[in-house]
C-alpha cells in the first residue's frame, strides 16, 4: 500500500480471488483508523468491501486483479474497488448486481456501481462522510 504525499490517495492491488478480500478488509481497517473514522463507520466500510469484492468477483467473467483506491476528500472518504477482467462473460450479472447494490446501500451513504459495455459491474465507489 502506498500513500502519495500530495494527493492523499492510497492504492492496493490484489489477485482476483475472494481469499484476498481479507487483505482488502485489513487494509481498509488501517485506513479507517488513519482517517479518523469511528468504529461503526470502519465496520460498515469493511463489510461493504466484502460485498463489493463478492459482486466484482461474481460477474460471470474471470478477474485477474482487484484494484482498491482510497481518496481523502477532506470531509469525505471514497473507496473505489475495480476489477480487472479478462476473457468472455459466461453468465448474466444482473441478479448479483441488484442484490449487491441493496446490501451496499444499507452500509454506505453513497454508492456508485459502474458497468462495462457488457453490462457487468467493473467498479464500485463507496463514499463515507467523516465524523465532525
Regions found by a protein language model. Give the residues of each.
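Conserved beta-strand-loop-beta-strand hairpin that lines the nucleotide-binding pocket
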Residues: 1-11, 55-132
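Long, contiguous hydrophobic alpha-helical segments, chiefly transmembrane helices and signal peptides
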Residues: 31, 49-53, 104
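Bergerat-fold GHKL ATPase/HATPase_c domain
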Residues: 1-47, 91
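Conserved ATP-binding N-box helix of the HATPase_c
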Residues: 38-63
Amino acid at each position: 500500500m502506498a500513500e502519495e504525499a500530495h494527493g492523499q490517495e492510497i492504492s492496493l492491488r490484489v489477485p482476483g480471488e475472494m481469499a484476498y478480500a481479507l487483505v482488502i478488509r485489513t487494509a481498509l481497517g488501517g485506513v479507517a483508523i488513519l482517517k479518523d473514522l469511528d468504529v461503526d463507520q470502519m465496520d460498515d466500510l469493511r463489510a461493504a468491501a466484502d460485498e463489493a469484492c463478492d459482486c466484482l468477483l461474481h460477474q460471470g467473467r474471470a478477474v485477474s486483479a482487484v484494484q482498491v483506491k482510497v481518496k481523502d476528500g477532506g470531509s469525505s472518504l471514497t473507496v473505489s474497488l475495480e476489477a480487472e477482467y479478462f476473457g468472455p462473460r459466461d453468465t448474466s450479472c444482473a441478479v448479483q448486481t441488484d442484490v449487491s447494490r441493496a446490501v451496499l446501500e444499507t452500509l454506505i451513504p453513497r454508492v456508485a456501481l459502474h458497468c462495462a459495455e457488457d453490462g457487468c459491474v467493473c467498479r464500485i465507489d463507496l463514499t463515507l462522510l467523516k465524523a465532525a
